[in-house]
C-alpha cells in the first residue's frame, strides 16, 4: 500500500486481523448528496430529474384559471450566484443563499372559439425568493449562525397490518387493524372491534362500518359478499336437500350428519371431526353432492337475492339468515338451487357479512353522504360537495399521494402476496387473478382494488392466516433527508401561491398581465425561511469539536413534524431492533427522555433511492467470500443468510468452520458454509463514528460505551492537540471528512507557507492546459465556533514538500497531523489517594496546568446596538458620564475598545449613551444649565461591559453601519485594513501566478529554436538562460517568436491566461471594495452595531469535568503539587490518579486494556527517542520492523527511505501510535508483546520500574513521604478529555437581582442572574434544627416579601441589623387565586 504525505509521517500500528475490504465512505455523503439532488445545480436544464425543486414545480404547474381560458406553465428554474460568501454571511449575520428564478409561460386561449385555440403566449423569469445553499461541510448559514438539518426517520408510506397485542379488550383478544399511510393526504384505518365487526375511519375520525366505504365505491350487497366469500351450493329437490361437496372446506369441521358414499358405505359418522383421511375417502368415492338434513340450511347466510321466477318477487335478500319461514317460502316458490356463504368459526369468519348486517345504507349516494357527514359535520350535503369530497379523499392527485415509495410498499405487501394450500379460493381469485394487473401500477392515488385488497388481507389475518407487520422494522421506516424535507416545504409554499394565482388568472388577459405580475413569491420564501430558521429538525450546529460536527450531521431523529413525540413514544420504538444492524448504531443515543428516538447512522450505512437504510455486505459464492459488495436494505436482508465479519477464512477466502455464526431473518443461527450468501464487510460495521472511536469497545458495558460515545462529542479542543496513542484507525477519516483540516485539492509542490496561508504549485499533469496552476489555501485563524470554542488552523507542510491530492495541508481544532485528537495522553495510576478520588473525583498534577496541557481558548462574542429611540438616537461615543480615566484609556476616539486590550468583568468595551426622558427642572438647575450649557445629565450610560466572571483579551472588533449613516473613524479603519490585507493577498497570488507562469515558459522555450525576438534575436537561434536573463523584463519573453507552432500557441495561451487573471483579480478587488463600503443590513431602528470578540483562556481547575473514552467520567477535586504526586521507580510522577472502584461495578474494562497498551506506546516512544539520538537509521528501521510486523496488520516499513524512517521515528518519539479497531482489536498477548518490546527483560529502566511479572503493575512511591505503597499499582497511559462542562461557566453568586413579576420571588439560573432555590426539603431541614429566624428570613425578606426587602436595605444602610418581616407576595397570589374561584377570603390582623 502507498502512504499519503501525512500518513508517512506517523503510521498507526494496527492490530486488525482482517484486511479492510471497503474503505470508510465519505461521512457527510447523506447530507450533501441529498441537497445536491434537491438543487440539481450542475445538471443541464433538459436533463434534470423529477426530484427536488423540479418535482415541486412540476407538481403544482400547470396552473389553470377557474374559467379555463388562461394557463401558467413552468419551463425551468435557475439559481443565481450568492451575493456573499460563507465567511461574509457569518460576519454580517445574514443567510448564505442564492436567488431562485423560474421561467414561467402564460398561455391565453381564445374565449370565442369552441375548441381551445391559443390567443397569445407571454413568458418571462419570475423571482421565487432565496434558497439557502449548503456549505462544503454539509451545514447551512442561517442569519449568520451555522445550522444543520437533521434527517428524520419516519414511518414509510404504504399499508401496515397490526394488532393491539390484546391490550384493548379485557379478554386479551387480539384486535387486528390496517392503516394506509400516504406521503400526503388522509389516513385510512380499518379495525376490528371486540364483536368482530370491521370498521373504517378517515383521519382518525368517527368509525363507520367498512361496508359503507365499499358501497360508496359502488359495490352492492351481493358484490361485496361475492368478493369476500366462497359459496356453498344447496339443491332443493323433491327427494330431499343436497349439498355440493368441496372436500377441502370440510377438513377440521364436525360432521352435523352422516356422510355416506353412493354405495351406502358410511364415510364420516355424525358428530365426528372430519380429518385428512376422511377427505381422501370422499375424493376416492367421487362424491360431488351429499344429502343433508332439511334443517342444514338454517342459520346460513344467503349469497344472493332469491327471486320467485314466476312472479319476480324477492323472497329473501342477500346476506339474510335462512330461517324456517324463508325455507317455507323457498319450497313454495319451488326454488331449486340456493347459494349460501361458506363460513365457519375456525378459519372463515363471517365478519364482513355481520358488518353488512349492522349497516342500513342502501346505495352509493347514501354511503357517500354518510362519509361527508362524518368528515364535515354540520354542513349541508349537496350533491356536488359530496362527490367532490369523496374524490378528493383518496382519488385526486392534488390532495392524495402515496409517492413512489408508498406505492412500492403497498404493492409488495398486497399484490405480491404469497399463497399456500390453506389460502381460500375467494382470496386467490381476488388477489391472484382479478387484481393481478395492479402489481406494476405506479400511480400515487388509491383505486377501488387497493382498498378492497387491504380489507381482504385484514379479514385473512383475522381468519388466522398471514402475519402482521413489525412497525419498528427498518423496512417500514425510512429516512427523510435535507433535500426531501426542503422539497416538502417548498411545495407547501407553492400550493399557497397556486391559490392566489388562480384568483388572478381570470384577469390576466383583460389587465394585460405578465407571469411576474401574477406570482407573488412571498409564501414560498416564508415557508423556506420558516423551515430553515425554526423547524424542529433545523438545529443549531454542535461545533464543540470535529466529531460533534460530523455526528450532528449523521444524526437521524424520530421526532419532528410528521414524526413521533417524546411523550407518546413507547419502549418498542426506542428499542434496538435486529434490522438496526449496520444501519443505525445500537450504542450512540442520548440519555434521558430522547433515548432511542435520536440515533446515529452506522459508519457504512447509506440511504437508497426510496430512503431506506442500506448496509454493505460481501457476496459469498459456494462458501467462498468474494470482494464483490452489495448494499442491502432491511427488507432484502431478511431473505439471506449473512455471516459475521470475524468468520474464519483460509488464504483463498473460503469459510473454514463447519458451522458459521450467521444471521437470518433477525435471528442468530449456525449455518454450514454452503448456506452462507453474504458476509459483513467490517467488524465495526454495526456502530457509529463516535462509538467506533472507542478502543477496546468490545470490552465495555453497553451503558458505559453509550456515555463514552456521547462524551467524546463534548471534548473541548486543547491548545496543543495531541493524537491518541491508542486509537481505532478511523481518526484520520473523521478529521478529514469533518472539514476541520485543510485538504489538498490537487497535488503539487508547496511554494509558500505562513500561519495564515499555504500556496501549492500544482503538478503539470493536474493543471489544465493554459491554466496557471496555483492553489491557495487561506487558513481560518482564531474564529469562534457555535459553542464559543476556538477554531484555528495550523499548516503541517513546509516549503518544498511534495504533496498529492487529498493530503492534509493544515490541521484544525482537535486534530494532530490529520488525525482526530480530542484530548491528551495522560499517565494514570489507579489507586485511592486520601479520599480525593472518592465517588469518581479526579486528582490531577499541577504539572498539567503549568504545561497548559488542558488549557483551551474560548471566544465570546459581545455585541451592542445603537437604536433610534423616541427621545433621540443612542450614540456610540467615548464621552460617557462618570467614566474613570483607566477605563476611558482603553477606548479609541470612537468609543470602541482597542484590539489587544486585556479586560476584566465590568470594563467598558463600547461606550454608549442613551437619551433620558425630560424631567421637571428646579429653578437652580435651570440657571446652571443656562450658564454652563447642556449637561451630561440628559443621557444615561448604557455601555457594553464585560460580563461578570470573564477575563480575556480583545481579539477582534467589527462595526456595522446602516446605509446612509456616516461611518466613524474606527469603522473606516477596519474597512481600510481589510482592503489592504485583501490587496496584499491578491498581489501575492498574482506574484505566484506570474512566477509559476514564467517558470513554465522557461521550461517550454529553453533549448528550442526561435524565428526572432527582442534584442535583434536572429532566426534559428536556440534560446538559452543567458538570453532570457538579459531581457529587461520577463514580459518581454512573450515577444519571442518561436519556430515551433505548438510552443508559440502555448505561449499565447499563457499570456492570455495571465492577462485574464489580472483582470479577474481587479474585478475581485472591486467586488470586495463594493461589499465592504456598501451599508450593512441591520434590523429596523438600529443605526449601528458593534461586535467585540474576547478570547478567554480557560486553564484546568477544580470543578471541571473530565472523562476517558469508556464512559469513565469525573470531576477534578484537587490539583496537587508535582512533588506530592505518587511517583514511579525512575522518579517520574504520574499525571492523574483515578479511583480503582470506578472500574469493576461499571464493567468498562476497555479502559484497563487501553492503559496497558498506552503504557507500551509511551515506553516504545521513549525507546525510539533514545535510538534517534544514539543509533543509526538501519537499527531504528529494524526496531520499527519488529513493532509493526511481528503481530497484527503488516506495514511496508521497507518501502520508506532513510529520511522518511528518521522523520517517522522523530514523530513517534513522544509515543507510538496504535490502532485497535472495534471488535477486531489487540488481544492480551499482543499487548504483553508490546510491553516486552518497550521494556525488555534485563533492561536498566525495566529493573528500576519494579514491574510485576506481566509488566502490568509497578511499585509506586508516595510523593510526600517517599515510601513505597503497600501494593503494586496499575499505571499506564490513557487518552483523557476535558469536557465542555467547565466550572467557570457554572459558578455563580447573587446578592440582589431580578424578581419574577407575579410571585416576586428571585428568578433562577445563571443566565437570569438568579438565586439558589430554597425548596421544600431544605425548609424541613431548618425546621428540624429549630432555626426559626433563619427560616423566617428565607421565607420572607430573602424571597418575596417586597416591603420587607426594601426595609432590610434601609436598615442595613442605617446600620441597624434587624428585619421586619411582612406578608410574602406568594400568599397574596394564593388569596387572589381563591377569590378567582368565587370564594371571598378576608384577612384580619390580630
Swiss-Prot record:
Q: Which cysteines are joined by disulfide bonds?
A: none
| One MF annotation (Gene Ontology) recorded for this entry | ribonucleoside binding
**An annotated GO BP:** DNA-templated transcription
Q: What EC designation does it have?
A: 2.7.7.6
State the UniProt keywords alphabetically.
Answer: DNA-directed RNA polymerase, Nucleotidyltransferase, Transcription, Transferase
Chain's role: DNA-dependent RNA polymerase catalyzes the transcription of DNA into RNA using the four ribonucleoside triphosphates as substrates.
NCBIfam families per record: PRK00405.1, rpoB
* Oligomer status and interactors: The RNAP catalytic core consists of 2 alpha, 1 beta, 1 beta' and 1 omega subunit. When a sigma factor is associated with the core the holoenzyme is formed, which can initiate transcription.
Describe the family membership recorded for this protein in Swiss-Prot or TrEMBL.
Answer: Belongs to the RNA polymerase beta chain family.
What HAMAP family has UniProt attached to this entry? RNApol_bact_RpoB
Question: What is the protein name given in its UniProt record?
Answer: DNA-directed RNA polymerase subunit beta
Q: Which organism is it from?
A: Chromobacterium violaceum (strain ATCC 12472 / DSM 30191 / JCM 1249 / CCUG 213 / NBRC 12614 / NCIMB 9131 / NCTC 9757 / MK)
Classification lineage? Bacteria, Pseudomonadati, Pseudomonadota, Betaproteobacteria, Neisseriales
Query: Could you tell me the gene encoding this protein?
Result: rpoB
Amino acid at each position: 500500500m502507498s502512504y499519503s504525505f501525512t500518513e508517512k509521517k506517523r503510521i498507526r500500528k494496527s492490530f486488525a486481523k482482517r484486511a479492510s475490504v471497503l474503505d470508510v465512505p465519505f461521512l457527510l455523503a447523506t447530507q450533501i448528496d441529498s441537497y445536491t439532488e434537491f438543487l440539481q445545480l450542475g445538471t443541464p436544464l433538459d436533463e434534470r430529474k423529477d426530484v427536488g425543486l423540479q418535482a415541486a414545480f412540476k407538481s403544482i404547474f400547470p396552473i389553470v384559471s377557474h374559467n379555463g381560458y388562461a394557463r401558467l406553465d413552468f419551463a425551468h428554474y435557475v439559481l443565481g450566484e450568492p451575493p456573499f460568501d460563507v465567511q461574509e454571511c457569518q460576519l454580517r449575520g445574514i443567510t448564505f443563499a442564492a436567488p431562485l428564478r423560474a421561467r414561467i409561460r402564460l398561455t391565453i386561449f381564445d374565449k370565442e372559439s369552441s375548441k381551445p385555440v391559443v390567443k397569445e403566449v407571454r413568458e418571462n423569469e419570475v423571482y421565487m425568493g432565496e434558497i439557502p445553499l449548503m456549505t462544503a461541510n454539509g451545514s447551512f448559514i442561517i442569519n449568520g449562525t451555522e445550522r444543520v438539518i437533521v434527517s428524520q426517520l419516519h414511518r414509510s408510506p404504504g399499508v401496515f397490518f397490526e394488532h393491539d397485542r390484546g391490550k384493548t379488550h379485557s379478554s386479551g383478544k387480539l384486535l387486528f387493524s390496517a392503516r394506509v399511510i400516504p406521503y400526503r393526504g388522509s389516513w385510512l384505518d380499518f379495525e376490528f372491534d371486540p364483536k368482530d365487526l370491521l370498521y373504517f375511519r378517515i383521519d382518525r375520525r368517527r368509525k363507520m362500518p367498512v361496508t359503507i366505504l365499499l358501497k360508496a365505491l359502488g359495490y352492492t350487497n351481493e358484490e361485496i359478499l361475492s368478493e369476500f366469500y366462497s359459496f356453498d351450493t344447496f339443491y332443493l329437490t323433491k327427494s330431499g336437500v343436497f349439498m355440493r361437496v368441496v372436500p377441502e372446506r370440510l377438513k377440521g369441521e364436525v360432521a352435523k350428519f352422516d356422510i355416506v358414499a353412493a354405495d351406502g358405505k358410511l364415510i364420516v359418522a355424525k358428530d365426528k371431526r372430519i380429518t385428512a383421511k376422511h377427505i381422501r375417502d370422499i375424493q376416492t368415492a367421487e362424491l360431488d353432492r351429499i344429502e343433508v338434513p332439511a334443517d342444514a340450511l338454517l342459520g346460513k347466510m344467503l349469497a344472493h337475492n332469491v327471486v320467485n321466477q314466476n312472479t319476480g318477487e324477492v323472497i329473501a335478500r342477500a346476506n339474510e339468515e335462512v330461517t324456517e319461514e324463508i325455507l317455507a317460502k323457498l319450497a313454495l316458490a319451488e326454488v331449486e338451487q340456493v347459494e349460501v356463504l361458506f363460513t365457519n368459526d375456525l378459519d372463515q369468519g363471517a365478519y364482513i357479512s355481520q358488518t353488512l348486517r349492522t349497516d342500513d345504507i342502501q346505495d352509493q349516494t347514501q354511503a357517500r353522504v354518510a362519509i361527508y357527514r362524518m368528515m364535515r359535520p354540520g354542513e349541508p350535503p349537496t350533491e356536488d360537495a359530496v362527490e367532490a369530497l369523496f374524490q378528493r379523499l383518496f382519488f385526486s392527485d392534488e390532495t392524495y399521494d402515496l409517492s413512489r415509495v408508498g406505492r412500492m410498499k403497498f404493492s409488495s405487501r398486497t399484490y405480491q402476496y404469497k399463497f399456500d394450500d390453506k389460502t381460500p379460493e375467494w382470496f386467490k381469485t381476488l388477489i391472484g387473478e382479478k387484481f393481478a394487473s395492479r402489481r406494476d401500477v405506479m400511480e400515487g392515488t388509491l383505486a377501488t382494488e387497493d382498498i378492497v385488497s387491504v380489507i381482504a388481507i385484514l379479514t385473512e389475518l383475522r381468519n388466522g392466516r398471514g402475519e402482521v407487520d413489525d412497525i419498528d422494522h427498518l423496512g417500514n421506516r425510512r429516512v427523510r433527508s435535507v433535500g426531501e424535507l426542503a422539497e416538502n416545504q417548498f411545495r407547501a409554499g407553492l400550493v399557497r401561491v397556486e391559490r392566489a394565482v388562480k384568483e388572478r388568472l381570470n384577469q390576466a388577459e383583460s389587465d394585460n398581465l405578465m407571469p411576474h405580475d401574477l406570482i407573488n413569491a412571498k409564501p414560498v420564501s416564508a415557508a423556506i425561511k420558516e423551515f430553515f430558521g425554526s423547524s424542529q429538525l433545523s438545529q443549531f450546529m454542535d461545533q464543540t469539536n470535529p466529531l460533534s460536527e460530523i455526528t450532528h450531521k449523521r444524526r437521524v431523529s424520530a421526532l419532528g413534524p410528521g414524526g413521533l413525540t417524546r411523550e407518546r413514544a413507547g419502549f418498542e420504538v426506542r428499542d434496538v431492533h435486529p434490522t438496526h444492524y449496520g444501519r443505525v448504531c445500537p450504542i450512540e443515543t442520548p440519555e434521558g427522555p430522547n433515548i432511542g428516538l435520536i440515533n446515529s447512522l452506522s459508519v457504512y450505512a447509506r440511504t437508497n433511492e426510496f430512503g431506506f437504510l442500506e448496509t454493505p455486505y460481501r457476496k459469498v459464492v459456494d462458501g467462498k467470500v468474494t470482494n464483490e459488495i452489495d448494499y442491502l436494505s432491511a427488507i432484502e436482508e431478511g431473505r439471506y443468510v449473512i455471516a459475521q465479519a470475524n468468520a474464519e477464512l483460509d488464504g483463498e477466502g473460503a469459510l473454514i468452520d463447519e458451522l458459521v455464526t450467521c444471521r437470518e431473518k433477525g435471528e442468530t443461527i449456525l449455518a454450514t458454509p454452503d448456506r452462507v450468501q453474504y458476509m459483513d464487510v467490517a467488524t465495526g460495521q454495526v456502530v457509529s463514528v463516535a462509538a467506533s472511536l472507542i478502543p477496546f469497545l468490545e470490552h465495555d458495558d453497553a451503558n458505559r460505551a453509550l456515555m463514552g460515545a456521547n462524551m467524546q462529542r463534548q471534548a473541548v479542543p486543547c491548545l496543543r492537540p495531541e493524537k491518541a496513542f491508542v486509537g481505532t484507525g478511523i481518526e484520520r477519516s473523521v478529521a478529514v471528512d469533518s472539514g476541520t483540516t485543510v485538504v489538498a485539492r490537487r497535488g503539487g509542490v508547496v511554494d509558500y507557507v505562513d500561519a495564515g496561508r499555504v500556496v501549492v504549485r500544482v503538478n503539470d499533469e493536474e493543471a489544465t492546459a493554459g491554466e496557471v496552476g496555483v492553489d491557495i489555501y487561506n487558513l481560518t485563524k482564531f474564529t469562534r465556533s457555535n459553542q464559543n470554542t476556538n477554531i484555528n488552523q495550523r499548516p503541517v507542510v513546509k516549503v518544498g514538500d511534495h504533496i498529492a491530492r487529498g493530503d492534509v495541508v493544515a490541521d484544525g481544532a482537535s486534530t494532530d497531523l490529520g488525525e482526530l485528537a480530542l484530548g491528551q495522553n495522560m499517565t494514570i495510576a489507579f489507586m485511592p489517594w486520601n479520599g480525593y478520588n472518592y465517588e469518581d473525583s479526579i486528582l490531577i498534577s499541577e504539572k498539567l496546568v503549568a504545561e497548559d496541557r488542558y488549557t483551551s481558548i474560548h471566544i465570546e462574542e459581545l455585541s451592542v446596538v445603537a437604536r433610534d429611540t423616541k427621545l433621540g438616537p443612542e450614540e456610540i461615543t467615548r464621552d460617557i458620564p462618570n467614566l474613570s480615566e483607566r477605563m476611558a484609556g482603553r477606548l479609541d476616539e470612537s468609543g470602541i475598545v482597542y484590539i489587544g486590550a486585556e479586560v476584566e468583568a465590568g470594563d467598558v468595551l463600547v461606550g454608549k449613551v442613551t437619551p433620558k426622558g425630560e424631567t421637571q427642572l428646579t429653578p437652580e438647575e435651570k440657571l446652571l444649565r443656562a450658564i454652563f450649557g447642556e449637561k451630561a445629565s440628559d443621557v444615561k450610560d448604557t455601555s457594553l461591559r464585560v460580563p461578570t466572571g470573564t477575563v480575556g483579551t480583545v481579539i477582534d472588533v467589527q462595526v456595522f453601519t446602516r446605509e446612509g449613516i456616516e461611518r466613524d473613524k474606527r469603522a473606516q479603519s477596519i474597512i481600510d485594513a481589510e482592503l489592504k490585507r485583501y490587496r496584499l493577498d491578491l498581489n501575492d497570488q498574482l506574484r505566484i501566478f506570474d512566477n509559476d507562469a514564467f517558470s513554465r515558459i522557461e521550461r517550454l522555450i529553453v533549448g528550442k529554436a526561435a524565428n526572432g525576438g527582442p534584442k535583434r534575436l536572429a532566426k534559428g537561434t536556440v534560446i538559452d538562460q543567458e538570453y532570457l536573463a538579459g531581457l529587461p523584463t520577463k514580459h518581454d519573453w512573450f515577444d519571442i517568436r518561436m519556430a515551433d507552432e505548438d510552443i508559440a500557441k502555448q505561449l499565447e495561451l499563457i499570456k492570455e491566461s495571465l492577462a485574464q487573471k489580472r483582470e479577474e483579480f481587479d474585478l475581485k478587488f472591486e467586488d470586495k471594495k463594493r461589499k465592504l463600503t456598501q451599508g450593512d443590513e441591520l434590523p429596523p431602528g438600529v443605526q449601528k452595531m458593534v461586535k467585540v470578540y474576547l478570547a478567554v483562556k480557560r486553564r484546568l481547575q477544580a470543578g471541571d469535568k473530565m472523562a476517558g473514552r469508556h464512559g469513565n467520567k469525573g470531576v477534578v477535586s484537587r490539583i496537587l503539587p508535582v512533588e506530592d504526586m505518587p511517583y514511579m521507580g525512575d522518579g517520574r510522577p504520574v499525571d492523574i490518579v483515578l479511583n480503582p472502584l470506578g472500574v469493576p461495578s461499571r464493567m468498562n474494562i476497555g479502559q484497563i486494556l487501553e492503559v496497558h497498551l498506552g503504557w507500551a506506546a509511551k515506553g516504545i516512544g521513549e525507546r525510539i527517542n533514545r535510538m534517534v539520538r544514539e543509533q543509526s537509521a538501519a537499527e531504528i528501521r529494524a526496531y520499527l520492523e519488529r513493532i509493526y510486523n511481528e503481530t497484527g496488520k503488516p506495514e511496508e516499513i521497507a518501502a520508506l527511505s532513510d529520511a522518511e524512517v528518521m522523520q517517522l521515528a522523530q514523530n513517534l518519539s513522544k509515543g507510538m501510535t496504535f490502532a485497535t479497531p472495534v471488535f477486531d482489536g489487540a488481544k492480551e498477548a499482543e499487548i504483553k508483546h508490546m510491553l516486552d518490546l518497550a521494556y525488555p527483560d534485563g533492561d536498566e529502566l525495566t529493573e528500576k520500574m519494579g514491574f510485576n511479572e506481566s509488566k502490568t503493575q509497578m511499585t509506586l512511591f508516595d510523593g510526600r513521604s517517599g515510601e513505597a505503597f503497600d501494593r503494586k499499582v496499575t499505571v499506564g497511559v490513557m487518552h483523557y478529555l476535558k469536557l465542555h462542562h467547565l466550572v467557570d461557566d457554572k459558578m455563580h453568586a447573587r446578592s440582589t437581582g431580578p424578581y419574577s413579576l407575579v410571585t416576586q420571588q428571585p428568578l433562577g439560573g445563571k443566565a437570569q442572574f438568579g438565586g439558589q432555590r430554597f425548596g421544600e426539603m431544605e425548609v424541613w431541614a431548618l425546621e428540624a434544627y429549630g432555626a426559626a429566624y433563619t427560616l423566617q428570613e428565607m421565607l420572607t425578606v430573602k424571597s418575596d416579601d417586597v416591603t420587607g426587602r426594601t426595609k432590610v436595605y434601609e436598615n442595613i444602610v442605617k446600620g441597624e441589623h434587624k428585619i421586619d418581616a411582612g406578608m410574602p407576595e406568594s400568599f397574596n397570589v394564593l388569596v387572589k387565586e381563591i377569590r378567582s374561584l368565587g370564594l371571598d377570603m378576608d384577612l384580619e390582623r390580630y
